[in-house]
């Protein structure tokens, strides 16, 4: 994983150093950036408690279980949806407007070693949680984290970091004004 990051940063450094003439290099720079396919701009590590209290009025006893899990979620720009028509140069080559795809979750990892059973209580005539019930509970927790991603601010951070990246990249290529917009910006809705 670190090797990918080093290669990416070497690639970006090479691009930044090789930018001389605006128009000619813009197409080269953006084509090389798009060839990366995904631009991961932010990574969150989230710890969540997943719990259930299985109260069945017709059964005697309690069933409770609590898991803690640590997940890693990366967000950024999927450059497969980016085309050169999304770049407009105006003001005689001084200003460039880049219209990027809206950020999305690029990877989500809830590794088995990061899931811990914190508490389990079974009393009365109840049976323990079986493997399928535990897996279903963990899947519900995963869905809850993904559904709450917007409230966590990961998309806002991904937009900010992508904006900073493209502004720095295109400023190094000689553009005085760089404006970065996002297609389908959900914050406008």
Model-predicted segments: where are they?
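Domain-level marker for long, solvent-exposed, non-transmembrane regions
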Residues: 19-189
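Sec-dependent bacterial lipoprotein signal peptides
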Residues: 1-17
């Amino acid at each position: 994983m670190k090797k990918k990051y080093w290669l990416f940063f070497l690639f970006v450094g090479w691009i930044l150093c090789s930018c001389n003439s605006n128009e000619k290099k813009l197409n080269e720079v953006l084509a090389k950036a798009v060839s990366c396919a995904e631009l991961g701009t932010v990574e969150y590590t989230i710890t969540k408690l997943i719990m259930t209290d299985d109260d069945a009025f017709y059964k005697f006893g309690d069933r409770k279980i609590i898991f803690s899990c640590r997940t890693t979620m990366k967000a950024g720009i999927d450059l497969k949806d980016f085309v050169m028509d999304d770049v407009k140069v105006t003001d005689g080559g001084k200003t460039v407007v880049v219209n990027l795809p809206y950020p999305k979750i690029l990877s989500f990892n809830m590794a088995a070693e990061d899931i811990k059973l914190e508490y389990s209580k079974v009393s009365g005539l109840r049976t323990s949680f079986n493997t399928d019930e535990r897996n279903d509970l963990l899947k519900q927790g995963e869905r809850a984290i993904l559904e709450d991603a917007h409230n966590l601010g990961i998309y806002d951070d991904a937009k900010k970091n992508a904006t900073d990246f493209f502004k720095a990249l295109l400023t190094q290529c000689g553009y005085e004004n760089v404006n970065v917009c996002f297609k389908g910006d959900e914050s406008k809705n």
